[in-house]
Amino acid sequence: AMLRDRWPGKLMLKGPISPSDARHAVSLGVDGLQLSNHGGRQLDRAIAPVDLIAPVREAVGPEVSLVVDSGVRHGSDIAVALALGADACSIGRAYLYGLLAGGELGIDKAIDILTDQFQRTLHLLGMRAAAELRAHGRELLVAP
């Protein structure tokens, strides 16, 4: 709450690990949540961020921004995250691999690959846009 009192801008919290953590953060004035397992480095047995999306979205409602930043390796991972209730995904490894392989052009290529994979996933689901996925995608997901 002290940080919220000192910062007038948007405030995002990274790393809530339960819906109750998320609710508490929102009650303290947080505008958005970044669901992360910190690359699996700090606590390798923590719940996967993808498994938190739906329960956290249900806990905090549609007004709070949800960004997923772990486990995004393929465009279909982005589709699943959006279908479960995320507003966006952050990527780390994909663009770093692109950078290492081809510099700036490699980054562009990595983003193009993710975009193509995401679009293909939408089309295979019979959808044209992310908005359709957000509205109807959850019913298409099958539990692993």
Describe each region flagged by the PLM.
Residues 45-58, 99-119:
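C-terminal helical cap(s) of enzyme catalytic domains, especially alpha/beta-barrels
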Residues 70-71, 126:
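Alpha-helical hinge/cap motifs
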Residues 116-144:
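Charged C-terminal helix
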Residues 1-68, 75-97, 130:
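Alpha/beta enzyme core
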